[in-house]
Curated annotation (Swiss-Prot):
Family matches, as HAMAP family: RuBisCO_L_type1
Assembly with partners or alone: Heterohexadecamer of 8 large chains and 8 small chains; disulfide-linked. The disulfide link is formed within the large subunit homodimers. Forms complexes of many stoichiometries with Raf1 with and without RbcS. RuBisCO interacts with the C-terminus of CcmM.
Induction cue: Part of the rbcL-rbcS operon, transcribed in light and constitutively during growth on fructose.
Residues that, per the record, bind substrate: N124, T174, K178, R296, H328, S380
Any one GO BP annotation for this protein: photorespiration
Natural source organism: Nostoc sp. (strain PCC 7120 / SAG 25.82 / UTEX 2576)
Reactions mediated catalytically: 2 (2R)-3-phosphoglycerate + 2 H(+) = D-ribulose 1,5-bisphosphate + CO2 + H2O; D-ribulose 1,5-bisphosphate + O2 = 2-phosphoglycolate + (2R)-3-phosphoglycerate + 2 H(+)
List of residues binding Mg(2+): K202, D204, E205
Location within or outside the cell: Carboxysome
Function summary: RuBisCO catalyzes two reactions: the carboxylation of D-ribulose 1,5-bisphosphate, the primary event in carbon dioxide fixation, as well as the oxidative fragmentation of the pentose substrate in the photorespiration process. Both reactions occur simultaneously and in competition at the same active site.
Name of this chain's protein: Ribulose bisphosphate carboxylase large chain
InterPro entries: RuBisCO, RuBisCo_large_chain_AS, RuBisCO_lsu_C, RuBisCO_lsu_C_sf, RuBisCO_lsu_fd_N, RuBisCO_lsu_N_sf, RuBisCO_lsuI
GO cellular component terms, semicolon-separated: carboxysome
NCBIfam families from the UniProt entry: PRK04208.1 (NF003252)
Amino acid sequence: MSYAQTKTQTKSGYKAGVQDYRLTYYTPDYTPKDTDILAAFRVTPQPGVPFEEAAAAVAAESSTGTWTTVWTDLLTDLDRYKGRCYDIEPVPGEDNQFIAYIAYPLDLFEEGSITNVLTSIVGNVFGFKALRALRLEDIRFPVAYIKTFQGPPHGIQVERDKLNKYGRPLLGCTIKPKLGLSAKNYGRAVYECLRGGLDFTKDDENINSAPFQRWRDRFLFVADAITKAQAETGEIKGHYLNVTAPTCEEMLKRAEYAKELKQPIIMHDYLTAGFTANTTLARWCRDNGVLLHIHRAMHAVIDRQKNHGIHFRVLAKALRLSGGDHIHTGTVVGKLEGERGITMGFVDLLRENYVEQDKSRGIYFTQDWASLPGVMAVASGGIHVWHMPALVEIFGDDSVLQFGGGTLGHPWGNAPGATANRVALEACVQARNEGRNLAREGNDVIREAAKWSPELAVACELWKEIKFEFEAMDTV
C-alpha cells in the first residue's frame, strides 16, 4: 500500500477519539483456537466500571490496545492480532470480582521466550487505573508454543537414572545457618548429612558469594564432602551448588567450575535472577549433563495475595518451559503456605504430561505438555519426622523431601538427624508398598520404626509437639 493510499484510507476509515474497550476486545461469541494462549484473570474493577469494560481493558492493554484510537491501527489486521475476552464468570462469594477468560493469538509472542510472554500478558496492565486489583490465576500454553521450548534440562526419569535411585522420594537438607558458616565448616555439615543417609544437601537461596564464604571455596569443600560421603556409603550423592550471580557471565562461570569438580547438580534462584538467565542456564545444563535445582525465592511477593499478582501455578508452568529439574512447591503440612488441593494441582502441572481442567484445584484450563519432561516437586519448610507419612502419601515418589531444621536440629548432630529421616522414609515407603494407609496409620508406622532406631526415637521425642496449624490463604 502506498502512502497516498494510506492517506486516502485514513480520511475515510479513521475516526480519532476514545471509545470503550468492550466495543473491540469483548467478544463473547469467539471460540478459542487450539493455538491460542489462554489466560484466566481474577479482576476487581473500580466502582462504576462495568465488568465487560474492565475485562476488555485487560485484553486490550495486554495485547494490541491503548487508551485512544490510533491511525496506525489501519496498517495492521487487529482482528488477527488482538487479545479477546471471550468469557466472564462470577467469583462465588464476591460481588465485585469476576474471572475474565482471554485468548491471545500465538503470533503475538516470540518463540521459546517466557520473558516475552510475561512482558506481554502481565507487564503493564496490572497498573491500570480502572482496576482495583488483578490476578493472573492460570494460563494455557498450546502445544504449538510448547514445542518451541527445551523445557527441563533432564526431567524426572533421567535424574533417577543418573542417581540410580528408584521407588521412593529423594531426601534432602538445606544447610543451616544459611549465612555465616566458613566454607570448611559448611563442607563438614554437608558431609555429615550425606553420610547419615540423605541423597542431597542444599545451598540456601541467599548463599551466593560473601566475605565469610566465597563461592569457589564453598564449591571445593562441598566437592570433597561429597566424594568422601559417596566412598563411605556407596550411594551417589549431590549438593545443590547455588550459581546465581550478579551477571549471566558470572553465573555460567560458576556453573562451569561445578562441572569441573564433577558435581551432578547446581541451583538457581529463578525469579530473582530472571527468566532469561534461567533459560540460559537450563540450556547449559542440558548441554553439559548437569541437573538443575530451582529455588522460588521471592515468589510470595508475587503470588501470596489472593486478589492481586500471579498465582504460583502460572510461575510453575513458566518454570517448566524455561527449564528446571526440581522446584520448591511448599509442603502442605509444614511452615509455608499451601492448601492441599491447590498445591497438588500445580504439582501435577509440573510432573504430569496431561492435566485436565479442575477448577476445584484452581486448574482453569486443560494442559497438554506434549511430552515435555517433568519437574520434580520439592517439599521443604518446617518439616520433621512426624510429617514423613503425610509427605509420602501426598507427594508420592517423584519428589524431594527436604528437612533443614528437621535434620540439623537433631540433639545428636547432623548425621543422626539424617539417619532418623532416612529410617522414617524407608519405613513409610515399605508400609505403603505393603498396602497400609499412611494417612490413617502413619504415626504407628513411625513409632514402630523408632523401636529399632535410636536416632529416630530421639527425633520423635524432640518434635512430637511441633505443628504449624494456620488457615491457608491460597484457596479457590
